[in-house]
């Protein structure tokens, strides 16, 4: 059938087009909604039982978190529920009995060593820092002398001597290097590493958010550069990635040099294991950055001759973006949704890591088994027969027991992270693919971006939920195998070389499958947008189109996608460099590389969302060109532009073959991916119908 407009040709095309658009993969949308309802239930419990400030600031023996205005009131503990906003530091009554000692929140740590009650009173008068129990009348110290009933590890005042201290992680740690001080650091080092990790993220969330915002600006700048400098953008990105990788590598080695050789290291922090962990982490990252930098430089050197061929590809994609300025809306919306989700996810993970329920503990040595801890009764924690609060000598204190079942929900949220991030990416890819396909096969004056987003929300959320779940299925086993391989190589028992080789092969196989499925999804979304069919049939149609042009597909995806990957590396490297500069000297962090790693990962996600705009435009245009060439031959729209180079042919010269009446940016006469379907219940006409 020819391409000229005729009633017969138009009628045949209309008969081949799907007349009705209906919802696709609705079952998968229901599954995704149920999964998210489960995540919300977990989040509610984590917000109720989790409190990161309990780990960061510490809490006293009465259940009050230091440095907090509102604390929960426990019946039977008159000193609970206090406003400790002006008391950010945690003070132990006896450093020799840390596990038994009463602990309170104070305004500041003792600035001098004290050995008498009168010195405590004088220090209170000068600084306003009360080192005795909250309800103790400090004026009684004038007559208390050095009575052991007053000054002991149970209070109401601390045992002597009260050592000069400095705050370390909001805990008053005596100055010096003696055995007592070492015991204090042993207690700090016994904290859960995961709790320290999330505590550092919580403390630096504003810096993480700021650097992620900068990553967004850098990504937008790269997209703008691709639009206006399409002919040389490949070279610019290669130069930028070399500069950024070299700068990040130098910064990491410089940070490692400072940690290892810096004179006058603060001995208060050098006794913490986190100091060593930072040094090891920086060294590891520096080595990895060096290896990555060398690999990137070598690969860029060998691909330099193929970069020139990408100019036509990026130029045509830039032309598409000029005609469709609304394409930038989809990545920006995806960015906002991703930031909102990641913020929610981090908040829930922090609360899950610190989730605990209040319990009462006797004044007796306790250990990590928590066998002595009892959950707090619903109506009362401790009931005293004493009518005088000042005479209250507690035989129990508030301790928070880990909520083990709730913490185990962490792994559900790991799956939720992968699936939801992939779902956000898939929604963006679908909107972009649909908009570009509508632009290619319809009039150039239309701006179909909002139209494509509307169709996605109204009809095709189930399809993107299914597509993102398929990727999740292959990604999770790969991550598990990668973790097992790392543990195997790190452990003393390295295992057999055969087992290690099998793990490597499995990891590589899952990685290849994931990449293949991701690429197939890109093209399947284009077919779904046009044909309004389910995911699996659409993937089959897209695969057939790609299989007939396998050489061109390999070239575009090997070189073009590598350049876009380099753009993402530029954003992640620059963001990591900024994060190191801002965080390396920030006090109070257990493990400052933790937020730096989070910054790099989040920045790469952000760059992936923004820069995948070009990737989707290129892949969609190529799929449209393949189908246009198959159906219309040299009379199709593809032959009139640089798109012809994508399939190994030269574009038609002016006057070489006069185009027919509606060739330029008008609907082609044959329906791409045409599938005859019966009318559905929804009478809305599919987007490919003629105007």
UniProtKB/Swiss-Prot annotation:
Q: Annotated region Disordered: where? A: 1-20
Q: Where is the composition biased (Basic and acidic residues)?
A: 1-10
Major place of residence? membrane
Statement: the UniProt record of this protein carries the keyword Membrane: yes
Membrane topology term: Multi-pass membrane protein
Question: Listed GO molecular functions?
Answer: transmembrane transporter activity
Q: Which residues are glycosylated?
A: 261, 385
Would you tell me the Gene Ontology cellular component terms?
Answer: membrane
Span-the-membrane segments of this chain are: 28-48, 205-225, 232-252, 282-302, 332-352, 408-428, 527-547, 562-582, 591-611
Which keywords are on file for this protein? Glycoprotein, Membrane, Transmembrane, Transmembrane helix
Question: What single Pfam family name could you report for this chain, choosing any that match?
Answer: Choline_transpo
**A single BP term in Gene Ontology:** transmembrane transport
UniProt entry tagged with the keyword Transmembrane helix: yes
**Record's subcellular location:** Membrane
At the top level, the lineage of the source is Eukaryota
Q: Which family does it belong to?
A: Belongs to the CTL (choline transporter-like) family.
Indicate what this protein is called per its UniProt record. Answer: Choline transporter-like 1
Task: Read off the lineage from the record.
Answer: Eukaryota, Metazoa, Ecdysozoa, Arthropoda, Hexapoda
Query: What gene is this protein translated from?
Result: Ctl1
